């Protein structure tokens, strides 16, 4: 098994050099305006001839490049399924809403997943939920029936988002790869903390939180939801006794500091893979690092477009892998 990944990891090590460091991100933030930031990215090799001057096309092309690299490594794509779950379940959510509301203009699909937009829409339209992966079938049908009969879009979101978290966690439990196990644990725990924070701000009930949160080993859904009912200080107090104590400090600092911590926690989870040479770990870590890099660049470009001060943009910027 280790020999299988030797070439792949060597290739990834060569590519890691071109990942943006914190200092590169600082240079991007220091660009005087949005156009200069785009130019900076293009000079760094982002996008291609067809995407020139178009931020969305540049970012999309970078996502495509990431998966092109992975496919070139001749590693089974099933190893990366868990990373595509957020997009896959998003497509299910978009399809349910489009079919139930008849609104075809609002819902954007991802095409670079196992079930792209048109195929997902047809499955929902035909109510052929058996064509969905096991982890999506029950949630797809339940969300469809809920939205059709109650018109409750938020409950529809909760049903599908919870199923996505359960699928990620299950993938972690079933994977022989430690990076997937750790990624799944951190992803679900951080999502649960986000749900608790949002629920506290919007005065949601315990029942709502327990329906939205996914069980995981590193947090107690029961204790976290109970803390959320008591207030933000209680959430922070609970988190201080867990592996997510830094999240409590970020939460106390500001909403944007907390959002930043949520993503940074995932990067911290995968960082040890920089020192492994004979497992699939560095390859998966590279994909996650690229996704984080693209998300960070998107945040900076949005800040530049809206003419936010550099300090305000910097507060939102994520930690880099390299």
What residue spans do the PLM features occupy?
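N-terminal domain-start signal
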Residues: 1-322
């Amino acid at each position: 098994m280790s020999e299988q990944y030797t070439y792949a990891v060597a290739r990834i090590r060569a590519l890691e050099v071109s990942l943006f460091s914190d200092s590169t991100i600082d240079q991007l933030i220091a660009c005087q305006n949005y156009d200069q930031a785009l130019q900076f990215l293009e000079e760094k090799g982002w996008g291609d001839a067809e995407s020139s001057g178009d931020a969305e096309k540049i970012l999309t092309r970078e996502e495509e490049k990431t998966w092109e690299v992975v496919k070139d490594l001749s590693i089974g794509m099933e190893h990366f399924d868990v990373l595509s779950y957020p997009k896959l379940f998003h497509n299910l959510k978009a399809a349910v809403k489009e079919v139930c509301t008849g609104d075809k203009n609002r819902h954007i699909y991802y095409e670079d997943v196992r079930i792209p937009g048109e195929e997902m829409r047809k499955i929902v339209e035909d109510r052929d939920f058996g064509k969905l992966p096991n982890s999506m079938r029950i949630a797809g049908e339940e969300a469809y029936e809920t939205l059709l009969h109650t018109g409750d879009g938020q409950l529809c979101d909760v049903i599908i988002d919870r199923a996505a978290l359960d699928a990620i966690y299950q993938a972690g439990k079933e994977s022989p790869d430690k990076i997937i196990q750790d990624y799944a644990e951190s992803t679900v725990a951080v999502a649960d903390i986000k749900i608790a924070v949002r629920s506290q701000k919007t005065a949601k009930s315990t029942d709502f939180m327990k329906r939205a949160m996914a069980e995981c080993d590193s947090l107690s859904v029961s204790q976290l939801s109970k803390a959320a009912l008591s207030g933000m200080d209680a959430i922070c107090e609970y988190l201080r006794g867990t592996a997510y104590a830094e999240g409590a400090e970020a939460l106390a600092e500001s909403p944007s500091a907390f959002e930043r911590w949520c993503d940074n926690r995932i990067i911290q989870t995968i960082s040890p893979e920089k020192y492994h040479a004979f497992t699939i770990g560095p390859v998966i870590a590279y994909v996650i690092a690229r996704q984080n890099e693209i998300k960070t660049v998107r945040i900076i470009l949005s800040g530049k477009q809206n003419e936010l001060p550099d300090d305000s943009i910097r507060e939102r910027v994520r930690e880099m892998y390299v």
